[in-house]
Amino acid sequence: MPAATWTASPSPPNWPVPMPRRPPMPRSVKRDRWIALGLLLLVMGVAYLVLVHPWFTQPMLAVQDDLQSLRERELRVRVQLQQAPQVSQRLQQARQTLQSRPGFLPESSAELASAGLVQRLERAVVDASPGNRSCAISNRSPLQPETKRFTRVAVQVRLRCGTPELASVLYSLENGTPRLFVDNLNVMAQRYQLSPNESGNGLDIAFELAGYLRPGSNAGPVNTGAAPAAGEASNAP
């Protein structure tokens, strides 16, 4: 009797088991999520503006600006220190040039400068007319100094001169050293007597004789009392 044979039945194929589908998310839930995300971002922004920015970010920015300004200042100081020898040399040269320039009066104060102007005037008149035969100072009085960029010192002058003598006096004053300036010149023709034994036609001249003090000089007030030249008051009208 033949032996019985057993054959296994074929196993069914392993097919993937389908997952159950989730139901679609309602639109209201999506909208709520976006609203919640927006509110979260808004809260974070407000918290940054209220808590972080004024207490941390803003002070750090201020410190950064201060550091930048300090770096720039340090750089300028270093450059100035490097240029200090050249600046000192140029300053010394400028001072020497200022001392040698004839444009400023040598006196250190307005009072002394006014006296120096009067002496210059008297020398110019004596050179133009020795013995005051044809030119004389009838009056000269210092004016108050004018302090602007440079201190102007002036003397109000009145002369009695002939025409050639006046030209000589003005030339001597304006072309000497230090340089002087003749301002507000007023010339009038007038018959006058230069000496008891002589008479003729001459000029009555009024002007301001001015000069400038060096920077840093004392520009204090001066005595402005009029003082006719000694020995010449008799020539005044």
Curated annotation (Swiss-Prot):
Annotated InterPro entries: T2SSM_b
Region spans: Disordered: 1-21
Signal peptide start and end residues: none
Biased composition (Pro residues): 10-21
Domain of life: Bacteria
Pfam family, one: T2SSM_b
Family annotation (NCBIfam families): T2SS_GspM_XpsM
Name used for this protein in its record: Protein XpsM
Originating gene: xpsM
